[in-house]
Amino acid sequence: MDLHMMNCELLATCSALGYLEGDTYHKEPDCLESVKDLIRYLRHEDETRDVRQQLGAAQILQSDLLPILTQHHQDKPLFDAVIRLMVNLTQPALLCFGNLPKEPSFRHHFLQVLTYLQAYKEAFASEKAFGVLSETLYELLQLGWEERQEEDNLLIERILLLVRNILHVPADLDQEKKIDDDASAHDQLLWAIHLSGLDDLLLFLASSSAEEQWSLHVLEIVSLMFRDQNPEQLAGVGQGRLAQERSADFAELEVLRQREMAEKKTRALQRGNRHSRFGGSYIVQGLKSIGERDLIFHKGLHNLRNYSSDLGKQPKKVPKRRQAARELSIQRRSALNVRLFLRDFCSEFLENCYNRLMGSVKDHLLREKAQQHDETYYMWALAFFMAFNRAASFRPGLVSETLSVRTFHFIEQNLTNYYEMMLTDRKEAASWARRMHLALKAYQELLATVNEMDISPDEAVRESSRIIKNNIFYVMEYRELFLALFRKFDERCQPRSFLRDLVETTHLFLKMLERFCRSRGNLVVQNKQKKRRKKKKKVLDQAIVSGNVPSSPEEVEAVWPALAEQLQCCAQNSELSMDSVVPFDAASEVPVEEQRAEAMVRIQDCLLAGQAPQALTLLRSAREVWPEGDVFGSQDISPEEEIQLLKQILSAPLPRQQGPEERGAEEEEEEEEEEEEELQVVQVSEKEFNFLDYLKRFACSTVVRAYVLLLRSYQQNSAHTNHCIVKMLHRLAHDLKMEALLFQLSVFCLFNRLLSDPAAGAYKELVTFAKYILGKFFALAAVNQKAFVELLFWKNTAVVREMTEGYGSLDDRSSSRRAPTWSPEEEAHLRELYLANKDVEGQDVVEAILAHLNTVPRTRKQIIHHLVQMGLADSVKDFQRKGTHIVLWTGDQELELQRLFEEFRDSDDVLGHIMKNITAKRSRARIVDKLLALGLVAERRELYKKRQKKLASSILPNGAESLKDFCQEDLEEEENLPEEDSEEEEEGGSEAEQVQGSLVLSNENLGQSLHQEGFSIPLLWLQNCLIRAADDREEDGCSQAVPLVPLTEENEEAMENEQFQQLLRKLGVRPPASGQETFWRIPAKLSPTQLRRAAASLSQPEEEQKLQPELQPKVPGEQGSDEEHCKEHRAQALRALLLAHKKKAGLASPEEEDAVGKEPLKAAPKKRQLLDSDEEQEEDEGRNRAPELGAPGIQKKKRYQIEDDEDD
């Protein structure tokens, strides 16, 4: 981008900064405002970073900002603004674009910005610029905390950020082309920092306890200073060349010389004796060309050994998603003076700053005061400075802050987190892999430092090492870490350097663990196992489980005399304490008003257990809590009537509520059913550690393949890396006797390349191991000819054992675990039992066989497989467990079902009697479906259990029958809560019908109380929603869950009211699913008819309260007649409204229309008079509400009449 392509305003702003004349910079009067304008322009740049690119192309930093910084730093406002602008201009390109762009156009902009940043870095490599920065920073640090202002802290932070940004710019290797020991741009920058004295200020900030707020900034700058350095090489600078280094260099030169000599010898052998034009062509017998003919070779015979069918072919392009990860970290040797400066800086940092700074940074990380991923700088510093300390002069006290079990735990925790995130966040897998590599390097250095402590002459240091190793080897997670990293190694995300460090760290860990086991004799370690245990449970009635089962009438009569005597004594005691007995559960989710039925059951349980005083006390307490309806007796009840009431409670067949585990079970699944639950239990135990058993965990193909992958680059690997590879493979092949794990064709190709390498003499250890494996293979191939085929596959331990010990050896070893064979007598008995039980309906054939099989114990699976082997069954699928498939109905069974239906169709519980008397036991849902299919019933509601009418008792107004009906009603209200959408349609349909069956009776008191609390408008809104949903479902023909969205504040408050939510549940409205939904929903299983009935049940006497003064007569005799007259009108109106909804749903019969159609007309005139006398506002409101209900013209009158009825 050229200067003349700049934006006009941007160009004018840059020109207004000033100009450079010689070495002097002359600033313009409005220089400060121009700098602020540039900051504003950068704040509003587009996604291509156009402003940044134009300023970079104009070299604004080199030509204007740096001269202003160095020559006009006394102008504090201008200096602050220039620092702000520089921090913005030098921020990393990745930070500007968010990530590395993939589109070519944005990638071009990214590279252009990076080029300008590299130019900025070169411009900053001057002592003068860093001298001004260090001088300003020094003056600011001289101020005490009470003198330092907020602007001073901001300037300190901006200077540190500017240094960080400049050091962060990556080097341009293609342009610099610097060799080792030559000064690169980064080296020049470090030398400028050293000459300006900024390094001393960094050491001061790191060591001062008063400057802890800059800890992370300092650590980030230090990590960028040593980015390309090797700590071990840096520690040996200035001490002369060690003998070990000289020998390593000599070995490397010897390898290069041998390869060069081999190439010369090969070229000499390739020269033919004859002239090339008389070479001729050759036919290679036994090697076919593309056709069926022999191959024709047109080159000299000395080139025949290099022939390949792939010659001349284009190599197959590897897809981008399958390419191996590239190495990003590059290590190089800086100039000698820079390395000496860095070595001294490291020494001072370790002695004065390391422990304090690392402790402060760790505190920031644990308290979450740092930014995201700042722990990577902590792990880099740990690995680098501990390695430097170990290589320079090992002093454990200098790194004591990070030399503890807690540090091991912190690194292991982050390493595991990065490993899991790399597997889940596939888009950022490469970034997570780099962080995981840093954590692995830190873990490796921790182990190396502990290993170095073992050979320390100080006894206290060796004891500390022993304690750390004891803790590390004891915990299972530390031992399993390397196995997990090997098994999930992915070369597409993790570079080869990660695999190298993983192999070296594993080698060090195994060496330390093996040595520790030998010195201890026996080592006890922690062991964690996830065990699955199966728990069987039966869906039983709670009363049967508790043992309090209501007895037969004869047994009740036998028990009653003893209870009556106790009750006579207790009833006379009017001072019987009721304080200690609470008839309801205050912690239950069920409201207190709905716990009356449960209180009745508790009274019966006390009587069955012989606890008469407790039963009487509970009865009196319940009377105090629930006085309405005189269910537990009236307030002035006599002792004799109390005893008779308790006798009725004892003999009443009270329905019992299911336990909390079975409360959500459907009514169709009331039959007993065994369910198996698999529970994972993590058991922590201790066991004696066996090193060979632990080593066997590495004997798998995934680990071996990772080692072989690294071995392929043996020429580029260091001698230590190759030693680590060979040592692990030798452990598997020799110590575990599993050399067959390496019997693989790609491994043998690698061995062939190694043995034919001219410099094979430098890899004596690798050559020896390759010859050992090849010798083992050929020895096995002489016995097992199939070993050549096995070369094509990677193998596990089971295949290895079969290869070496013979195929089928695993079956012989596991013969003791096999089930015993079947004798002819057992087979005959099995055949007999199967034929006897296979046609029995409602019975599991295999379970019946297991119950009558008196031979050797067998499992269900063994019996099923043997039945299939004997030909008695076609497949294992024929023996599914009970309830997994539908048994077909036979003709006789259908006739029996029709006969039972005709016999019990007039009873109160048709379905219950059929289920008790039918021969072939089936579930309730199957019987209902069959009755519908046969046409015996038209709808499911015809099979519902009919409510029994309350009969007056001769003793009390509420007798035993009323008690039974009352309890049954409350239990149905509690059990008929709407279930989730995932239930079956047949279950949801029957439950919805049960809800509608008790809507009017259960909602009467609840709706009245809601009206009294001021929820009239939300109730009308809910009524309209139900009717609209019913209309939509009739028009569309399909139904789906409809959310109830409260748009007004009143409706929203009502939806949060517990009593209003209770009404919604009773109407069948489903609450929002946890974490997935927000609003209540009208379920899809409710039909339009059911929705209209629910809407009709919501009408309450809202207007009747205003009309009540006009309806109250002055004469008592007239009052009774008017009340009877009003009740008659209300009943007639209710029947008319229900008929209107039935007609709309198509359910009304002509007889009903004739019977009901005449009666509302008689009641209409009087109601019309009442309505006409109402206020005009209420009349208009009624007219507006009538169309919403979708009724005929008299809908308004009907609703008022229904509200009057429910008010009574």
From Swiss-Prot:
The ranges of region (Interaction with PARP1) come to 1000-1098
Q: What induces it?
A: Regulated by the cell cycle. High levels in S, G(2) and M phases, with highest level in S phase. Low expression in G(0) and G(1) phases.
Q: Indicate where this protein resides in the cell.
A: Nucleus; Chromosome
Q: Which GO terms describe its biological process?
A: branching morphogenesis of an epithelial tube; cell cycle phase transition; cell division; cellular response to bleomycin; cellular response to cisplatin; cellular response to hydroxyurea; circadian rhythm; detection of abiotic stimulus
Q: Which residue ranges does the record annotate as region Required for homodimerization and for interaction with CRY1 and CHEK1? A: 1-309
User: Main subcellular localization, coarse class?
Assistant: nucleus
Q: Which Pfam families match?
A: TIMELESS (PF04821), TIMELESS_C (PF05029)
Q: Which residues carry this modification: Phosphothreonine?
A: T1089
For the region DNA-binding domain, give the residue spans.
816-954
* GO CC terms: chromatin; nucleoplasm; nucleus; replication fork protection complex; site of double-strand break
Compositionally biased residues, Acidic residues: 664-679, 971-990, 1172-1181
Biased composition (Basic and acidic residues) is annotated at 1122-1131
Q: Where is this region: Required for nuclear localization?
A: 1182-1199
Residue ranges, annotated region (Disordered): 655-679, 971-994, 1091-1131, 1143-1208
- Organ and tissue specificity: Expressed in all tissues examined including brain, heart, lung, liver, skeletal muscle, kidney, placenta, pancreas, spleen, thymus and testis. Highest levels of expression in placenta, pancreas, thymus and testis.
Which key words tag this protein in UniProt? Biological rhythms, Cell cycle, Cell division, Chromosome, Developmental protein, Disease variant, DNA damage, DNA repair, Mitosis, Nucleus, Phosphoprotein, Transcription, Transcription regulation
Q: Which residues carry this modification: Phosphoserine?
A: S281, S1074, S1087, S1149, S1173
GO-annotated molecular function: DNA binding; enzyme activator activity; identical protein binding
User: How does the entry describe the domains?
Assistant: Residues 1182-1199 comprise a putative nuclear localization signal; nuclear localization is required for the regulation of period length of the circadian clock.
Associated clinical condition: Advanced sleep phase syndrome, familial, 4: An autosomal dominant disorder characterized by very early sleep onset and offset. Individuals are 'morning larks' with a 4 hours advance of the sleep, temperature and melatonin rhythms.
Role summary? Plays an important role in the control of DNA replication, maintenance of replication fork stability, maintenance of genome stability throughout normal DNA replication, DNA repair and in the regulation of the circadian clock. Required to stabilize replication forks during DNA replication by forming a complex with TIPIN: this complex regulates DNA replication processes under both normal and stress conditions, stabilizes replication forks and influences both CHEK1 phosphorylation and the intra-S phase checkpoint in response to genotoxic stress.
What does the record note on quaternary structure?
Monomer. Homodimer or homomultimer. Component of the circadian core oscillator, which includes the CRY proteins, CLOCK or NPAS2, ARTNL/BMAL1 or ARTNL2/BMAL2, CSKN1D and/or CSNK1E, TIMELESS, and the PER proteins. Interacts with PER2. The interaction with PER2 is direct and via its second PAS domain. Interacts directly with PER1 and PER3. Interacts with CRY2, CHEK1, ATR and ATRIP. Interacts with CRY1. Interacts with CLSPN; the interaction is required for leading-strand replication. Interacts (via N-terminus) with TIPIN.
- Which family, according to UniProt? Belongs to the timeless family.
Could you tell me what this protein is called? Protein timeless homolog
Which source organism?
Homo sapiens (Human)
